[in-house]
Curated annotation (Swiss-Prot):
The keyword Ribonucleoprotein applies. This is Small ribosomal subunit protein eS1. The gene is rps3ae. Keywords: Ribonucleoprotein, Ribosomal protein. One of its GO terms (biological process) is translation. The lineage of its organism: Archaea, Methanobacteriati, Methanobacteriota, Thermococci, Thermococcales. Pfam families: Ribosomal_S3Ae. InterPro entries: Ribosomal_eS1, Ribosomal_eS1_arc, Ribosomal_eS1_CS. Belongs to the eukaryotic ribosomal protein eS1 family. It comes from Thermococcus onnurineus (strain NA1). It comes from the Archaea.
Length: 200
């Protein structure tokens, strides 16, 4: 089967790249409108919808936050600038594995919440307790997670809720209350997913 001239194929590929332009991608305002990457396209419409991954360390310069992965989706392009909205976050698998050791107990909680200004989110919390704990203690810790997360959703708008979750402030409050039940190693908001935005 004829494959065509390799030089022509290479030239065609090169021409396609020549037609593309680079767009500078920016984080939302509550993450400081910081530049988070570059993305190429031959049409600005093709940039819309792309998801850019970065870390909280890259945004803040805090080297202790490299495990916090942030996802931003491009929704608007003006000139060579692409603007994003927060899509979700996760903790790296390697970081979670480092917390969960033998003779510890991992308590997970998954909560669908609505922020004060109407954003619907799925929030996944996690508490790591030293040693094995009783089922009743697990249940009590999960209740603490739920109560704090729901209370925050009632009190905070979307932007403030996200910031408290990804920076660790919310997890610190969970840890403080959970320690009244049993000594714990760590509390984390391990994942957030935006389910729906309020109707305009």
């Amino acid at each position: 089967m004829a494959k065509g001239n390799p030089r022509k194929r290479a030239a065609a590929t090169k021409d396609k790249w020549k037609m593309k332009e680079w767009y500078v991608v920016y984080a939302p305002d509550f993450f400081g409108n910081k530049e988070i990457g570059l993305t190429p396209a031959d049409d600005p419409e093709k940039v819309i919808g792309r998801v850019i991954e970065t870390t909280l360390k890259d945004l803040t310069g805090d080297f202790t936050k490299g495990q916090v992965k942030l996802y931003f989706q491009i929704y608007d392009v003006k000139g060579q600038n692409a603007y994003t909205k927060f899509k979700g976050h996760t903790l790296s698998r390697s970081y979670i594995r480092s917390l969960v050791r033998r003779r510890t107990t991992r308590v997970d909680g998954i909560f669908n919440i609505t922020t004060k200004d109407g954003y619907k989110l799925r929030v996944m919390g996690m508490v790591i307790a030293y040693r094995r704990i009783q089922t009743s203690q697990e249940r009590a810790i999960r209740e603490i997670m739920r109560d704090i997360i729901y209370k925050k959703a009632e009190e905070l708008n979307y932007k403030d809720f996200i910031l408290e979750a990804v920076t660790g402030k919310m997890a610190t409050e969970i840890a403080k209350e959970a320690r009244k039940i049993y000594p714990i190693k760590r509390a984390e908001i391990r994942k957030i997913k935006v389910l729906a935005e309020p109707e305009a």
